[in-house]
Amino acid sequence: MSPFRLGAKISLSLVFFTSLAFAGGESSASQVQPIMMLPFAVLLIAIAVVPFISRNWWKKNYPYVAVGLGLIPVVYYVFALDNGARMLQIGKEYISFIVLIGSLFVVSGGIHLHISGNSTPYANVTLLAIGAVAANILGTTGASLILIRPFLRVNKYRMRGFHVVFFIFVVSNIGGALTPIGPPLFLGYLKGVPFWWILESIWYMWLIALVIVLAVFLVIDTISFRKFEAGPKHLLRSQLHEDAEVNGMHNVFFLAVIVAAVFVETPSFLREALMIAAAAGSYFTTRNEIHVKNDFNFGPIKEVAILFVGIFATMVPALDWLELNAGSVGLTKAGQFYWGTGVLSGVLDNAPAYLNFLSASIGLFVDKNIVAEVNHLVASHGAGMTAISSVRADEIRNTFAALTRFHPDLVAAGSVPLSVVQVSYLLGNRDLYLKAISVGSVFFGACTYIGNGPNFMVKSIAEQAGVAMPSFFGYIGRYTVPVLLPTFALIWFLFFRS
């Protein structure tokens, strides 16, 4: 299938499903049978295991697996629970999610960077640090796809698997913890988490984790570099004489459009329309030779789009069950949310993990009576604030204060979506839990190849370039356990253990 036909099919599908999703109102969680969480577990286990058992079978059949399992909860909600609005709501979130990462994927594929100079350990650390910052501007997907090829080229004479692993650690995951330009934090932004709140709240955790991981990389790369220097010098000299090259710089404009579109909230379809327009503009104005140099094709984003149709559909019963039963499973402390979100992010995927534990925190702490009181205050524009006599009056006031601070336009309009009220309760009363969920989901996404969307894309690009990458379990045993787990344990000890 040609890229044009593929793009046309995706665009038409998005238009159709967007019309359905945005037509549905916001619905509350439904009481579901625990067995309905089974398709979610089966799909995520299949994603983690089946490609390593039979890669060819998986490549041929993963669309049927994802869509087939996804249809089970859709049918259950529509016909058994009579709550089709819940699926329409999650469809809206899926569309926002896939349009964002898809547009970043297309635009970043139109930028070709070639970096000249010597591949030294300090140069590599600098490039990774730049990538960490870029991940907060372009999203982890955009930064990863723009920088992985230059990173591979500059290290091509001494490239080892650990170079790519640490690239995944820093650029594809930990680096992007400060802004919601990409999953999983973008999903929280859609629920009402303010854009700049994350940066203001966790920058020091981000800095500590980043410094530790980069320091470990510097030690390992220094050892590798010394071994390389003892080898043939002509390889090093030939690299120094290669010219720097930048092509497709007009795509920076389209990246800016996508980033700016993240801030667009009304009308509800405009953000996605701007992103799709930017992606189309980038694709059709980029010279084919640039796409060829970047080995650009739609395969990776097609796989992500199809798999996440199944993930988003099957995770709804798990989200609803956790929201309504969080207390019964013993989740009470911020540290438990940190490790719980982290483990689920590492072994499954950090986007659904973030939503699962956000739902759990809402179910554990947010009382429907508080929501009703806050909605009354919003509708009356704060009238009667001093007359609140509930035993949870402070929580009500704190929630309304958070709404007024972070969502003044919604408060002024006199109507606030349920999810925004729920998130504002956490912001005003239990912000440590929201920090734990945010940090756990982003950081631990680096623990496996399937922890975050860009991980597999980066691995695939590296393998196409001839890099011998560690296996699924080799990645965990050689890098996650000795490097990441002690780092994340330190973050827990410093900020979440109490």
Language model features: what each stretch is:
Residues 143, 156-198, 202-203:
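Hydrophobic, small-residue-rich alpha-helical packing segments that form membrane-like cores
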Residues 105-115, 130-143, 171-179, 205-214, ...:
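Helix-loop-helix module between adjacent transmembrane segments
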Residues 140-147, 183, 345-359, 441-459:
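Membrane-helix boundary/coupling elements in multi-pass transport proteins
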Residues 2-109, 117, 204-323, 480, ...:
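Hydrophobic transmembrane alpha-helices of multi-pass small-molecule transporters
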Residues 80-153, 157:
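Long, structured ligand/cofactor-binding scaffold of large enzymes
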Residues 122-174, 356-439, 465-470:
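Hydrophobic transmembrane alpha-helices that form the pore/transport pathway of multi-pass ion
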Residues 257-369, 373-398:
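Transmembrane helical segments that form the transport core of multi-pass membrane transport proteins
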